[in-house]
């Protein structure tokens, strides 16, 4: 049998099963549900056709696993891993490639970036709806090392749709003067115009000799939302200001606050003393809905009554001084209070 190469058709790839060989792929929809750092990556799909190549499959797994290549951060290149596989030399570059006729996928550095691709990670459905499990189990050639910490949290797009995000930070360098971590961000809901990439951001975190956060080379995440009517990309900033680089037994990372929210409806509103009308929504969010404006006159006695508790500027009232409650000697507002009646009972009777 010939060894596979990048241009080999997927339907021609054979995998040994005991004393026989069987096709590793068949035409249909291939579903991939791998794991990284012990956490599920989410399910991505790849259409296997008669013209699909091994390189197409490699690109799919690399993108669906969130493996970030050296070129993604040109200013601060992503590091390769030290190669400790017996009989091999050179670094292990993150990504997918063919090694001695076998497929190999190298994750990014850090224990929580380690890929797990077993038999249960794949399902393929043919045109008739028959579902099978292809013989595509991957073993581990080198265990992942490197102190890591990860945090899973939810953000919301412009329609209030919840989006899962995972940020993993891995120790990259430590000197007498500083500690450097690299963070990687993944989102299974990332929907690029083409492809299945779940990687949505990366950058470096610098800490000084006292463990204090100094700076980040990048603090923004961008999640593509093609195929849905949400604003695309969904962009937000990570605040690393409360993260420290102190030495601990187990590194940890957590998202403590975010300013997005799920959809909500207006439940009630309140009026503040400054005239601000603030809405209270079912999702716990409060937002300013409007602003009351008041006016005062030099001669309020000259106001002309228009009925229904309404008055208009008169000839000798002077010009109105308008503003928010409490400004420029203007009266105040008491929320929830009832106005005293100014009805002339004697006249009305």
Predicted regions span which residues?
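S/T-rich, low-complexity, solvent-exposed segments of bacterial secretion/appendage proteins
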Residues: 1-349
């Amino acid at each position: 049998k010939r060894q596979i190469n990048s241009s080999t058709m997927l339907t021609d790839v054979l995998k040994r099963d005991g004393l026989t060989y069987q096709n590793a792929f068949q035409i249909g929809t291939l579903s991939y549900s791998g794991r990284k750092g012990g956490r599920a990556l989410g399910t991505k799909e790849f259409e296997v056709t008669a013209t699909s190549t091994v390189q197409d499959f490699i690109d799919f797994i690399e993108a669906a696993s969130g493996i970030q290549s050296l070129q993604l951060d040109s200013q601060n290149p992503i590091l390769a891993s030290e190669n400790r596989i017996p009989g091999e030399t050179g670094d292990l570059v993150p990504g997918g490639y063919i090694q001695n006729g076998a497929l190999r996928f190298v994750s990014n550095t850090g224990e929580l970036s380690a890929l797990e691709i077993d038999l249960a990670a794949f399902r393929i459905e043919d045109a008739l709806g028959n579902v099978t499990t292809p013989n595509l189990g991957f073993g581990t050639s080198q265990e992942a090392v490197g102190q890591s910490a990860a945090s899973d949290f939810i953000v919301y797009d412009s329609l209030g749709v919840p989006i899962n995000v995972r940020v993993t930070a891995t120790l990259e360098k430590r000197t007498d003067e500083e500690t450097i971590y690299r963070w990687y961000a993944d989102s299974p809901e990332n929907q690029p115009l083409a492809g299945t990439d779940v990687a949505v951001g990366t950058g470096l975190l610098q800490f000084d000799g006292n463990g204090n956060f100094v700076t980040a080379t990048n603090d923004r995440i961008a999640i593509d939302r093609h195929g849905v009517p949400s604003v695309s990309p969904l962009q937000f900033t990570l605040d690393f200001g409360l993260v420290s680089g102190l030495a601990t037994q187990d590194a940890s990372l957590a998202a403590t606050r975010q300013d997005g929210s799920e959809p909500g409806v207006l439940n009630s509103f309140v009026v503040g003393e400054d005239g601000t009308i603030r809405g209270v929504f079912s999702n716990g969010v409060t937002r300013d809905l409007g602003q009351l404006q008041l006016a005062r006159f030099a001669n309020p006695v000259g106001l002309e009554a228009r009925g229904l508790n309404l008055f208009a500027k008169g000839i000798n009232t002077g010009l109105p001084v308008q503003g928010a409650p409490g400004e420029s000697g203007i009266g105040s507002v008491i929320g929830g209070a009832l106005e005293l009646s100014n009805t002339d009972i004697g006249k009305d009777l």
